[in-house]
Amino acid sequence: MGIVINLFLIIAASIVFFVVGFYIGRFFLERIGTTKVLEAEERAVQVIQEAQKEANDYKELKVNEVNQEWKKRKREFDSEVTIKNNKFAQLQKQIRQKEVTLANQMRDIKETEKKLQEQREELKHQTQNVQNRSAELEKTILEQNQRLESISNLTAEEARQMLIDNMIAKAREEAAETVHQIHEEATQKADRIAEKIMLTAIQRISFEQATESALSVVHIQSDELKGRIIGREGRNIKAFENATGVDIIVDDTPEVVILSCFDPLRREMAKLTLQKLLVDGIIHPVAIEKAYQDAKKEIEDVIMSSGEEAISSLQIPDMPAEIVNLIGKMRFHTVYGQNLLQHSREVAMLAGLMAAELKLDAKQAKRAGLLHDIGLVLPETEMPHALAGMEFLKKFNMSPVVLNAIGAHHGEVEKASPIADLVDAANIVSLSRPGARGAVTAEGNVKRLESLEEIARTFPGVIKTYALQAGREIRVIVEGDNVSDSQADVLAHDIASKIESEAQYPGQIKVTILREKRSVAFAK
């Protein structure tokens, strides 16, 4: 019995402990759950706040990117608008020039019509005189015939012969009048046809007409680069001018450097040299010389490509490489202020179109027109450029028609074919554009500068000569091994004396002798 009671008590105690433990455990579990929920809620709030912050940061970043992209697009748009406005202004300028040209042509046509009207009146007057003379002649012949009939002492043969002579004289008079009328009609018809051909050729081509300038503008990123271009005590500018033969002008104009030279080829090489230096960012005498040599090679490629492009555009086949090179050099020469290559292409187009209208060989006309001024880019010669070009092209087995047209376009040789007349006429039309006459002064100045350089090159030991400062200074580079310092002083005096005796110039000209000696050794 005691055992049963003990078991019962143990079971009851176990139940009590189980119930108490159950509620105690539930209580602690509820406390722990509540704490976890609070922590989860706090974590959720923190995550939401972090997400909102990241979203705001991302939004701000994207807004900045969009703003930057918009500003970039706006700058590109503004730049494009500026370029289009400039092109539009150029087109307007070309249209105004063409309007002036057409107005001049209309004035010439009206003057020609006036002259034709005067010639018609004169022809009418002459026709009336011829008719009057013919009537008088008929009256005289009639009187003589009547006298012959009344004279009985003439034999029949004599009377017959006199009548025949009178009829022959009348026939000759009528024939002369007919020939005169045919000649007048043929002349008028030829003038109309020539005028039509010329106007048709002019209307079918269009070339820009711009006077070449002696200045080139190079844009730089900032004015800070001007100091680097000048160099310490101006040594970079001196090295640049000695290497290129071009004046470099650094003034207060923002982000601009100006190159000045009468020779377009030297000016273009100097421009390319300066652009290479600005891209590399390294500017000193050695870098200048290297950039100049690189630019010189690139210009040679540009010359060949320009010649090939001109030949291709005119569809002229089979041109030797030496001639192609000279045609490319025309791009860097001027005639009456006009680019020589553009002028030659214009003459070739005009001559070719007129030859096609006249059923002549258009390819020969275009070839002669393109090469008619090739003598201007040949080395110095005492012959006129037309004869020099003709003699130079003889070694390439050019057609005699082409050679004659080239040599005769300034009258040095007699024209031997219609092609020569067409090339001469096309050359006159091209040089008669508005503004060509005003460019004669600039062309004369260029010739004067070239003559100054040529005078200095005649002395022994001279390597290069450059006319700078619009001809106010001649810079002469001599061989350091062959010309000493004392000889350089004498050479400067001799050059100045020869310029005084042979050249005409305003003011005074400074002669500067540059003598440089380089010693090179290699460490092995």
From Swiss-Prot:
<dbReference type="InterPro" id="IPR004088">
    <property type="entry name" value="KH_dom_type_1"/>
</dbReference>
<keyword id="KW-1133">Transmembrane helix</keyword>
<dbReference type="InterPro" id="IPR003607">
    <property type="entry name" value="HD/PDEase_dom"/>
</dbReference>
<dbReference type="InterPro" id="IPR006675">
    <property type="entry name" value="HDIG_dom"/>
</dbReference>
<comment type="similarity">
    <text>Belongs to the RNase Y family.</text>
</comment>
<dbReference type="GO" id="GO:0004521">
    <property type="term" value="F:RNA endonuclease activity"/>
</dbReference>
<dbReference type="InterPro" id="IPR004087">
    <property type="entry name" value="KH_dom"/>
</dbReference>
<dbReference type="InterPro" id="IPR036612">
    <property type="entry name" value="KH_dom_type_1_sf"/>
</dbReference>
<keyword id="KW-0540">Nuclease</keyword>
<dbReference type="InterPro" id="IPR017705">
    <property type="entry name" value="Ribonuclease_Y"/>
</dbReference>
<dbReference type="Pfam" id="PF00013">
    <property type="entry name" value="KH_1"/>
</dbReference>
<keyword id="KW-1003">Cell membrane</keyword>
<dbReference type="GO" id="GO:0005886">
    <property type="term" value="C:plasma membrane"/>
</dbReference>
<keyword id="KW-0472">Membrane</keyword>
<dbReference type="InterPro" id="IPR022711">
    <property type="entry name" value="RNase_Y_N"/>
</dbReference>
<dbReference type="Pfam" id="PF01966">
    <property type="entry name" value="HD"/>
</dbReference>
<feature type="transmembrane region" description="Helical">
    <location>
        <begin position="2"/>
        <end position="22"/>
    </location>
</feature>
<dbReference type="GO" id="GO:0006402">
    <property type="term" value="P:mRNA catabolic process"/>
</dbReference>
<feature type="domain" description="HD">
    <location>
        <begin position="340"/>
        <end position="432"/>
    </location>
</feature>
<keyword id="KW-0812">Transmembrane</keyword>
<dbReference type="Pfam" id="PF12072">
    <property type="entry name" value="RNase_Y_N"/>
</dbReference>
<keyword id="KW-0694">RNA-binding</keyword>
<feature type="domain" description="KH">
    <location>
        <begin position="214"/>
        <end position="299"/>
    </location>
</feature>
<dbReference type="InterPro" id="IPR006674">
    <property type="entry name" value="HD_domain"/>
</dbReference>
<dbReference type="GO" id="GO:0003723">
    <property type="term" value="F:RNA binding"/>
</dbReference>
<keyword id="KW-0378">Hydrolase</keyword>
<keyword id="KW-0255">Endonuclease</keyword>
<protein>
    <recommendedName>
        <fullName>Ribonuclease Y</fullName>
        <ecNumber>3.1.-.-</ecNumber>
    </recommendedName>
</protein>
<comment type="function">
    <text>Endoribonuclease that initiates mRNA decay.</text>
</comment>
